[in-house]
């Protein structure tokens, strides 16, 4: 995205060309899901990048409806294809330690009872990404989002860890793309969607 695009924008602009400073040059995203032995539905996400900036902030937008083609430059009317309850999963990695995973939903006020005060962005107005009080309270933090990591609903990692002998060899192999990934160029996450309240138990 370019031209000052924000997450809540209804008509974001897709640009191509050079990567802006301090931004990740993403090469691949992966997504998978399955049903756990406890009957919960799990979502698995991963990303790869070519540069090693240290920190990484990725968003995975999951929609009910088909979206515009984001592989070509131009203005995209995502406002017409977002639905109440669509998901935005944020993957925030500070350069060391475990990433922080959080979840917001697309709020409109039409069927979800949301008000502008439920928007996650400061000063946001409906429609927006945020969390109604029933969702916001799931992690015990009043911040208009569900902190999946703090609530124990998700776990994630980036390939930057050392083994017990203090020998660091963080390069891993992606068998799908058949490429080796140096330290801090791969991140993954597993999310319990049932525990997070995205799906009711038994659904």
Please name every model-derived segment.
Residues 1-203:
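Surface-exposed extracytoplasmic segments
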């Amino acid at each position: 995205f370019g031209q000052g695009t924000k997450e809540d924008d209804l008509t974001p602009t897709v640009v191509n060309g050079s990567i802006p400073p301090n931004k990740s040059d993403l090469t691949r995203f992966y997504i998978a899901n399955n049903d756990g032995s406890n009957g919960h539905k799990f979502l698995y996400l991963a990303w790869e990048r070519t540069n090693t900036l240290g920190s990484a902030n990725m968003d995975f937008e999951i929609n009910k409806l088909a979206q515009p083609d984001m592989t070509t430059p131009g203005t995209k009317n995502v406002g017409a294809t977002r639905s109440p309850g669509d998901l935005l999963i944020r993957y925030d990695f500070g350069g060391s330690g475990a990433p922080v995973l959080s979840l917001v939903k697309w709020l409109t006020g039409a069927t979800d009872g949301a008000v502008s005060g439920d928007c996650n962005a400061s000063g946001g107005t409906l429609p927006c990404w945020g969390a109604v009080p029933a969702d916001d309270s799931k992690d015990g933090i009043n911040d208009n989002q569900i902190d999946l990591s703090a609530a124990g609903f998700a776990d994630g990692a980036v390939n930057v860890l050392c083994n017990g002998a203090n020998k660091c060899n963080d390069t891993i192999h992606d068998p799908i793309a058949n490429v080796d990934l140096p330290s801090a160029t791969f991140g993954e996450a597993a999310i319990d969607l049932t525990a997070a309240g995205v799906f009711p138990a038994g659904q």
